[in-house]
A protein has these predicted regions:
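Short aromatic-glycine-(Arg/Gly/Cys) micro-motifs in beta-strand/loop hairpins
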Residues: 1-23
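Conserved NAD+-utilizing ADP-ribose enzyme module
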Residues: 23-24, 44-54, 60-170
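Short, flexible loop/turn elements at secondary-structure junctions
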Residues: 8, 35, 62-64
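Extended catalytic/binding region for NAD+/ADP-ribose chemistry, centered on the ART fold
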Residues: 20-45
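Short, conserved beta-strand segments within well-ordered enzyme catalytic domains
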Residues: 3-5, 30-31, 57-59
Length: 170
C-alpha cells in the first residue's frame, strides 16, 4: 500500500521527536492513502512555513494490521462518537487520564487510522469544550462533514514498517 505525506521538505528519515503533540490521534507521523489530500497538505504547509510543496511517498505491507506486536486502532472512514471522543482527548492539552483507551497521548497505539478532523470540526470541538454546544450537537455537526483519511505512526517500531519510495514536488 502506498501512503503519502504532504510537506515543505523532503523526508529521508522520519524523526518522531520533530512531530507535534495534540494532533487528532496524538503526536506522530501522519500520512494518507489519498494522493490529492497529501498534495493539498503540501501546498498548505509550504504556504505557512515557506519552501516548496513536496509529497513524500512511502510503502507499507498491505497486511500490516495483522502484525502481532503492532497495536492498530482503526476507526474506518466514518466519523463516530468513539472517533470524536478520541480526537478531542488527543487534542486536549489538560487531559489527565492519558491511559484511557480513547486517547493516544501515551502512544498505546502504534498506528491509528481514521478520518481527518478538518478546521470546521476543530471549531465544533472548541464549542463543545467551551460548553457552547452539547455532545449530540457536536456529533450531528460532524456527521455531515466531508472526511478524508489519515494514518498516524506513533512508535519507532511502526515507523520501521514504512519504506520511502520517492518524492515529488507538487
Amino acid at each position: 500500500m502506498r501512503l503519502y505525506h504532504g510537506s515543505n521538505v523532503i523526508i529521508d528519515t522520519i524523526n518522531l521527536a520533530m512531530c507535534r503533540p495534540y494532533k487528532d490521534f496524538g503526536k506522530g507521523f501522519y500520512l494518507t492513502d489519498i494522493k490529492e489530500q497529501a498534495e493539498k497538505m503540501a501546498v498548505r504547509v509550504s504556504t505557512i512555513y515557506g519552501g516548496s510543496p513536496v509529497v513524500n511517498v512511502f510503502e507499507i505491507e498491505d497486511d500490516f494490521k495483522k502484525i502481532d506486536d503492532i497495536k492498530v486502532k482503526d476507526f474506518g472512514l466514518e466519523t463516530t462518537e468513539e472517533w470524536a471522543t478520541f480526537v478531542m482527548n488527543n487534542r486536549n492539552r489538560i487531559l489527565t487520564d492519558v491511559t484511557n483507551s480513547l486517547c493516544n497521548q501515551d502512544n498505546k497505539y502504534d498506528i491509528v487510522i481514521g478520518p481527518v478532523a478538518d478546521d470546521n470540526m476543530a471549531l465544533l470541538f472548541r464549542q463543545y469544550e467551551n460548553e457552547m454546544i452539547d455532545f449530540a450537537t457536536l456529533l450531528k455537526g460532524m456527521i455531515y462533514k466531508k472526511t478524508s483519511s489519515q494514518y498516524s505512526f506513533h512508535t519507532e517500531k511502526s515507523i520501521k514498517l514504512l519504506r520511502k519510495v520517492e518524492y515529488y514536488y507538487g
